[in-house]
């Protein structure tokens, strides 16, 4: 009860910035899930081949990773962070508005690269601001943050669905199976098997399509609707920024991010309160910079090996789990329509929505659970659940019912892994390392690499390899998590004093002492 009261008190003191950071992650979610269902329409719009349109995915993921790594540049002050979030969320609305006018695949790839940069910046900055505000109490707020990702990712396919073209924009003399709307590798693999003597249309550029086909114009409405829905988000950031810049008339006002720490200080003995009057620390946190600054910090020279091992193993866990999230959502449709399941294309189209829907539900359920369960326990349950679910799917690979149940189960188990791992790692390192930047970067790399790797294996080995990859990557995630627990036990930074005292002590020590 006391913990819940403290958390609710923290939320009341930081309500506006917290709601703003949550809404910014809604923009992130909107932008992360719309490419899959709109792929065929965008391909028709740009008159491009499958290998050409695949660069759109790559450009978004690569720039998302780059934006995550460089996001720390904008975290040095609160004003920089808010300006970065305002620019990024506004850029996402502009991207949605501009996509219908991209008639060339290179232009579309460039636009999606801009979206990726904005998403990466949002990912790093919003996560870090919440961790910086709430520190040891950040687990609950991170769960809500990532709930908004799932909500946005669930909403964007639902918005796009009524506007997707049912017509086939392929040449009339093509005998290709065009019903596999969602995925590049599925179509190219099927065509490669069934049309050995013919040149597959996946390597051909579509002939010019006249505007009469409407394949580009109908889906344009979906993008414009998403642009309008997202528009209040940059406005909310601008309101918070203007509120932060008001104190020209009242210089006594302190930064918004300080209130959570003031509340923590109120529970300390008087001598500790007097010793920690360091508000500038919260304007520029030395422990939370961009990836390159973290790697070059001189005050990490004395850190024990376990300090670096915790960073690496935690990032590897998220490399696997976030990579599985991206790969499963991208290829579950292709797996379902293939033999032995041969699910109807319309029915299979519900699988990605089911997956993201249960991710959203899982993040919603994790909000109250995270206030009563340790982040380490939640991550353990999640990773074990992922492995068990993939094993069940592999054993019952001929059963469509198990595919739908397993998809929902995977969504639940993967939903809270990232925020729980972030809260656990930051607390293990006493908020002194570069955990947020490293973990966000590791998750971004995993989402990009595993999606490409699973797609290549799927194309070469067949649909059964999809579940085998899931089992392997799930087991690797579990192995890395066990190693993380081991290094956490070995870490000399584990004090016997309460966590609350640690959150204060970390302000007075910027480097490890051997």
Curated annotation (Swiss-Prot):
<feature type="transmembrane region" description="Helical">
    <location>
        <begin position="466"/>
        <end position="486"/>
    </location>
</feature>
<dbReference type="GO" id="GO:0016020">
    <property type="term" value="C:membrane"/>
</dbReference>
<feature type="glycosylation site" description="N-linked (GlcNAc...) asparagine">
    <location>
        <position position="203"/>
    </location>
</feature>
<dbReference type="InterPro" id="IPR011701">
    <property type="entry name" value="MFS"/>
</dbReference>
<keyword id="KW-0812">Transmembrane</keyword>
<keyword id="KW-0325">Glycoprotein</keyword>
<feature type="transmembrane region" description="Helical">
    <location>
        <begin position="438"/>
        <end position="458"/>
    </location>
</feature>
<feature type="transmembrane region" description="Helical">
    <location>
        <begin position="307"/>
        <end position="327"/>
    </location>
</feature>
<dbReference type="InterPro" id="IPR036259">
    <property type="entry name" value="MFS_trans_sf"/>
</dbReference>
<feature type="transmembrane region" description="Helical">
    <location>
        <begin position="139"/>
        <end position="159"/>
    </location>
</feature>
<feature type="transmembrane region" description="Helical">
    <location>
        <begin position="221"/>
        <end position="241"/>
    </location>
</feature>
<dbReference type="GO" id="GO:0022857">
    <property type="term" value="F:transmembrane transporter activity"/>
</dbReference>
<keyword id="KW-0813">Transport</keyword>
<protein>
    <recommendedName>
        <fullName>Major facilitator superfamily domain-containing protein 4A</fullName>
    </recommendedName>
</protein>
<feature type="glycosylation site" description="N-linked (GlcNAc...) asparagine">
    <location>
        <position position="177"/>
    </location>
</feature>
<keyword id="KW-0472">Membrane</keyword>
<comment type="similarity">
    <text>Belongs to the major facilitator superfamily.</text>
</comment>
<feature type="transmembrane region" description="Helical">
    <location>
        <begin position="19"/>
        <end position="39"/>
    </location>
</feature>
<feature type="transmembrane region" description="Helical">
    <location>
        <begin position="82"/>
        <end position="102"/>
    </location>
</feature>
<feature type="transmembrane region" description="Helical">
    <location>
        <begin position="376"/>
        <end position="396"/>
    </location>
</feature>
<feature type="transmembrane region" description="Helical">
    <location>
        <begin position="400"/>
        <end position="420"/>
    </location>
</feature>
<feature type="transmembrane region" description="Helical">
    <location>
        <begin position="53"/>
        <end position="73"/>
    </location>
</feature>
<feature type="transmembrane region" description="Helical">
    <location>
        <begin position="347"/>
        <end position="367"/>
    </location>
</feature>
<keyword id="KW-1133">Transmembrane helix</keyword>
<feature type="transmembrane region" description="Helical">
    <location>
        <begin position="107"/>
        <end position="127"/>
    </location>
</feature>
<dbReference type="Pfam" id="PF07690">
    <property type="entry name" value="MFS_1"/>
</dbReference>
């Amino acid at each position: 009860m006391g913990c819940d009261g403290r958390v609710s008190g923290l939320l009341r003191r930081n309500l506006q910035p917290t709601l703003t950071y949550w809404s910014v992650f809604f923009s992130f979610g909107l932008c992360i899930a719309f490419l899959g269902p709109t792929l065929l329409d965008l391909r028709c719009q740009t008159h491009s081949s499958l290998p050409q349109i695949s660069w759109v995915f790559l450009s978004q993921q690569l720039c998302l990773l780059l934006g995550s790594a460089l996001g720390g540049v904008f975290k040095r002050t609160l004003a920089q962070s808010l300006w970065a979030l305002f620019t990024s969320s506004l850029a996402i609305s502009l991207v949605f508005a501009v996509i219908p006018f991209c008639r060339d695949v290179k232009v579309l790839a460039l636009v999606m690269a801009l979206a990726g940069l904005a998403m990466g910046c949002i990912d790093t900055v919003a996560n870090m601001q919440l961790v910086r505000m709430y520190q040891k109490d950040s687990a609950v707020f991170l769960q809500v943050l990532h709930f908004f990702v799932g909500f946005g990712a669930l909403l964007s396919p639902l918005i796009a669905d009524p506007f997707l073209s049912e017509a086939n924009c392929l040449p009339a003399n093509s005998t290709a199976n065009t019903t596999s709307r969602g995925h590049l590798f599925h179509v190219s693999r099927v065509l490669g098997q069934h049309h050995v003597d013919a040149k597959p249309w996946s390597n051909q550029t579509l002939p010019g399509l006249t505007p009469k086909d409407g394949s580009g114009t109908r889906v344009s409405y979906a993008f414009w609707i998403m642009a309008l829905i997202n528009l209040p988000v940059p406005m909310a950031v601008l309101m918070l920024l203007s509120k932060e810049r008001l104190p020209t008339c009242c210089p006594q006002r302190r930064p918004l991010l300080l209130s959570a720490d003031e509340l923590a200080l109120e529970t300390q003995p008087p001598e500790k309160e007097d010793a920690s009057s360091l508000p500038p620390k919260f304007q520029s946190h030395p422990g939370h910079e961009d990836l390159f600054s973290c790697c070059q910090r001189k005050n990490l020279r004395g850190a024990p090996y376990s300090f670096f091992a915790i960073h690496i193993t935690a990032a590897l866990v998220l490399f696997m789990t976030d990579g599985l999230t991206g790969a499963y959502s991208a290829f579950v449709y292709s797996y379902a329509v293939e033999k032995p399941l041969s699910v109807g294309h319309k029915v299979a189209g519900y699988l990605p929505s089911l997956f993201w829907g249960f991710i959203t539900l899982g993040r919603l359920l994790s909000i109250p659970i995270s206030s009563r369960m340790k982040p380490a326990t939640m991550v353990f349950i999640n990773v074990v659940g992922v492995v068990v679910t993939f094993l069940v799917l592999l054993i019952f690979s001929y059963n469509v019912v198990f595919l739908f149940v397993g998809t929902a189960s995977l969504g639940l188990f993967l939903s809270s892994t990232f925020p729980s791992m972030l809260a656990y790692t930051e607390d293990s390192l006493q908020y002194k390392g570069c955990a947020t930047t490293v973990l966000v970067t590791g998750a971004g790399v995993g989402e990009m690499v595993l999606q490409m790797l699973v797609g290549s294996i799927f194309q070469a080995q067949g649909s059964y390899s999809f579940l085998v990859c899931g089992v392997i990557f799930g087991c690797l995630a579990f192995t890395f998590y066990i190693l993380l627990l081991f290094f956490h036990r070995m870490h000399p930074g584990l004090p016997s004093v309460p966590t609350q005292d640690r959150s204060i002590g970390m302000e007075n020590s910027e480097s490890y002492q051997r």
